[in-house]
Regions:
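Core subunits and conserved enzymes of cellular information-processing
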Residues: 1-128
Length: 128
């Protein structure tokens, strides 16, 4: 697999459309950090790491009635074309209704947190 983050976002998108209660994927620290941001922002109900070889990352999805809380996910920086932004260039997603996720030297964080800390980095994805 050439892009594990895109694979993660696609699994979440497909599980949400199929109204599945949870989704599993191979574990990595980057994916776990991204999942914890989704949980903190209220897009995912629960994040857990299942032991074993190989480790699995399990996300419990949130729904409002019969509709997923996550309306859209979009990968920005890809392996073939990286997208870096400075602290002043961090975009707002849907006028603040969504979240941009950025990988900075201090770790993975939302665009709002990176702006407050005056950090730039690789723009991973948008979630709304």
């Amino acid at each position: 697999m050439t892009d594990p983050i895109s694979d993660m976002l696609t699994r979440i998108r497909n599980a949400g459309r199929a109204l599945l209660p949870a989704v599993e994927m191979p574990h990595s620290r980057m994916k776990e950090n991204l999942a914890n941001i989704l949980k903190k922002e209220g897009y995912v109900a629960e994040v857990s790491v299942e032991a074993g070889m190989p480790k699995k990352l399990k996300l419990k999805l949130k729904y409002q009635g019969k509709k997923s809380v996550i309306e859209g996910l979009r990968r920005i920086s890809k392996p073939g074309l990286r997208h870096y932004v400075g602290a002043t260039e961090i975009p707002r997603v849907l006028s603040g209704m969504g979240v941009s996720v950025i990988s900075t030297p201090e770790g993975v964080m939302t665009g709002t947190e990176a702006r407050k800390k005056n950090l730039g980095g690789e723009l991973l994805c948008y979630v709304w």
